[in-house]
């Protein structure tokens, strides 16, 4: 359905592992909206460590300060920073109206 709006929601750990999809989307002029939930954790890895390694965590906390807006822009996408939940609806509307690849952080 190429005429449909595509919104993908991922944590920052997932986005770090798969962010090359943004470069592919911009190269192919795809109107994709990527929402990044920045909780500073490799969530799935941590979940597996909780379930199978008795809560012994290794390298799952992401303490660095990656600027995902700048990263999006470096890949040719539009980056929009959302700092309050009250801003989210307007940011999503703006992203849809832009009809391009957008990363909401």
Predicted features and spans:
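Thiamine diphosphate
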Residues: 1-105
């Amino acid at each position: 359905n190429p005429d449909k709006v595509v919104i993908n929601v991922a944590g920052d750990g997932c986005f770090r592992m798969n962010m090359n999809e943004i470069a592919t989307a911009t190269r192919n002029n795809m109107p994709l909206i990527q929402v990044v939930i920045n909780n500073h954790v490799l969530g799935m890895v941590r979940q597996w460590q909780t379930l199978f390694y008795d809560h012994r965590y290794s390298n799952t906390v992401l303490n660095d300060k990656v600027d995902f807006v700048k990263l999006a822009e470096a890949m040719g996408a539009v980056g929009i920073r959302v700092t309050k939940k009250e801003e989210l609806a307007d940011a999503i509307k703006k992203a849809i109206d832009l009809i391009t690849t957008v990363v909401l952080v």
